């Protein structure tokens, strides 16, 4: 069995939330359960990752309610610091997770081809482009994002149900609450849409 790292940068940084995609459960704050993977074994490992692509929020409505969800842009930058958590899962599990994120069945991925191209659109779903981010401990790192680059679609602030899940994930990466707020306030889709005091109240009451 071949394994790859799946790098998450949105709600899947929260390990409890990501396990719903593996095991077929409903995440707290979500309106519907996930289908789950054919192989429900937990990740072999997980660890933080710094992704050098910009994080932003877009789209209008999802299982998290009205509001945007997280994507990364297509242009790498040394000064871009998107926090993430990556999970060591099988290639089959990665394909199953990507299928669920795109609302389809049976997405087939040629991982070698993606390594060559770095960005490869495979479906018209919200997360239809698979991205190769490099290697760690001899295994390739992949994630997925929109087929559209940052700025090609309008920025939309996310729901607090969604942001709470992201905040929990950021806290597990070692951020304190002020660091979580400072991090999120810089991101397109939050910057200029949600003020700091409202963000604090929405996340923690």
Q: Model features per residue range: what roles?
A:
Residues 1-205:
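Glycine-aromatic micro-motifs
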């Amino acid at each position: 069995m071949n394994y790859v790292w799946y790098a998450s940068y949105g709600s899947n940084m929260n390990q409890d939330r990501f396990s719903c995609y593996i095991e077929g459960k409903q995440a707290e704050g979500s309106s519907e359960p996930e289908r789950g993977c054919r192989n429900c074994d937990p990740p072999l490992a997980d660890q933080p990752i710094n992704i050098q692509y910009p994080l932003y929020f877009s789209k209008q409505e999802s299982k998290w309610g009205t509001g945007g969800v997280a994507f990364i842009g297509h242009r790498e930058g040394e000064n871009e610091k998107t926090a993430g958590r990556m999970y060591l899962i099988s290639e089959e599990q990665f394909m199953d997770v990507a299928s669920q994120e795109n609302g389809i069945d049976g997405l087939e991925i040629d991982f070698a081809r993606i390594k060559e191209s770095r960005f490869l659109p495979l479906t018209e779903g919200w997360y239809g482009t698979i991205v190769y981010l490099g290697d760690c401990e001899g295994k390739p790192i992949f994630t997925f994002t929109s087929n559209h680059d940052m700025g090609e679609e309008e920025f939309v602030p996310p729901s607090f149900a969604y942001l709470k899940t992201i905040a929990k994930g950021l806290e597990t990466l070692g951020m304190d609450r002020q660091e979580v707020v400072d991090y999120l306030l810089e991101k397109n889709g939050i910057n200029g849409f949600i003020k700091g005091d409202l963000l604090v109240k929405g996340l923690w009451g």
